[in-house]
């Protein structure tokens, strides 16, 4: 619910009433208040005005699960997001999750990797605060010989977004 509240606050032109949030999610005002407070504790500046509702004033410069989910507008990619401050390797974690049956499109993100791996098993230095370290778990219906091309296609797609 936090991610959805954050998404609504981001897209709103003004205030969103607490009652509107209650109705939308089928929860009590207390549940909405708790979710808003959790967002505030995470660094979001949310203004609350009596008889008006809530308004997002500023977002922290942080990468969190709620932040990532609130910015994703997709049918399958990152519907499931797992965020870690520190992890051995996002790739190893994604492999573990795949074995547990997590769906295609699961995104594993970390601020720091202690044993990050790059292409061909090379060591990937990934200290805190220096990048976005992630593994997108996909189960494509392609020939395994073509799987190595997916990294190139993803990099190209991301570069085109910033042009």
Task: Describe every region a protein language model picked out.
Residues 2-157:
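N-terminal lobe of the biotin/lipoate ligase/transferase fold
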Residues 161-163:
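Conserved small/polar residues in nucleotide/adenosyl-binding loops
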């Amino acid at each position: 619910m936090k991610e959805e509240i954050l998404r609504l606050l981001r897209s709103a032109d003004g205030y969103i009433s607490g009652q509107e949030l209650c109705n939308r999610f089928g929860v009590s005002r207390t549940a909405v208040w708790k979710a808003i407070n959790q967002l505030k504790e995470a660094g979001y500046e949310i203004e609350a005005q009596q008889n008006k509702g809530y308004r997002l004033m500023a977002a922290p410069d942080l990468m969190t699960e709620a932040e990532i989910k609130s910015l994703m507008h997709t049918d399958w990619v990152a519907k499931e997001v797992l965020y870690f401050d520190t992890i051995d390797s996002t790739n190893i974690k994604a492999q573990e999750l795949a074995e547990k049956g997590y769906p295609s499109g699961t995104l594993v993100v970390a601020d720091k990797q202690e044993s990050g791996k790059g292409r061909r098993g090379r060591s990937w230095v990934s200290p805190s605060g220096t990048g976005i370290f992630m593994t997108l778990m996909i189960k494509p219906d392609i020939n395994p010989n073509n799987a190595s091309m997916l990294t190139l296609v993803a990099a190209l797609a991301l570069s085109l977004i910033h042009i």
